[in-house]
Amino acid sequence: MTAEIIVSTFNEIGCHAFSPGSKDFAAGLGFIQEMQMLANFPFISANILDVNGNRLFDPYVIADVEGVSVGIIGLASNFIHSDVYIQDPIEALNELVDEVSSQSDVLVLMFDSEEADIIKMQTSGFPIDLVIRSKSKTRSQDGGKRDIPSYSCGDRGKYLYQFDLTVADPNEQFTDLAVYENQMSQAEKKLNKMRKGNLITDLHNVYKDDPPSLKKIETYESQIQSAKDALKNSVNSIKMSKHELGKTVTDRPDILRIVDDGKAKINESFGPQPPSGTPPGQNQKNIGHDHDGDGIPDH
């Protein structure tokens, strides 16, 4: 029933695509297919097949987002399940990535991935603009310094990641602004630490007789300048923003109604459910709303 609540809320909120991963098959293929029928958005996967090697889902979708063609591919790292066969993800990606790229201004990969497959994907030269990955507890601060920006949004549903893409020339690579903004910020912090509280200090003069420190200063200044140049010269850009889904977020009444109705059905069937991690036997009454899905009441 919890899965039904999630699907029903996304039906109202809007969703371009869902790419299932290993955890989504915990209740079996039949359950996934039931949720797929309930959803008014597509389930996609290029490499989750039935046991005979036939596709269970469309491998990708092309979405029109404000006049920009966005190709979205679904992919998963290998996992073992009696109901499905998982094709090698890099092999599956290689078979269709050019087909999707030819139809897209922007190509996004939704990847339920092991780190080893991310590394293989990064070194394969695929024309992918952005990777949004699951199967990782990390909450990315930027997309990393490899060729393709790769973001992990964590596993608790506590944050909403927003990606604003500026497309000036679909044939040019995207610049992940967060990488260079973080590079500048970290270098500035190191320089300020060397200033020891006096932000107008001339570091070159202070450390003129300390060659190792001068070398550090030059390195940090070079990092700042190279980041500024990258930001200035970017043609297409990705700007990431994170939004904490806490008490300051105003609930949409229609979404809250779906959640509360779903919880009421669960309580009718199984009795009141405690937050995740509650020891057996503890009081399960007065459980508040858990709108971010982490099992902890928000209010």
What are these regions (language model features)?
Residues 1-299:
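Acidic, metal/ion-coordinating pockets
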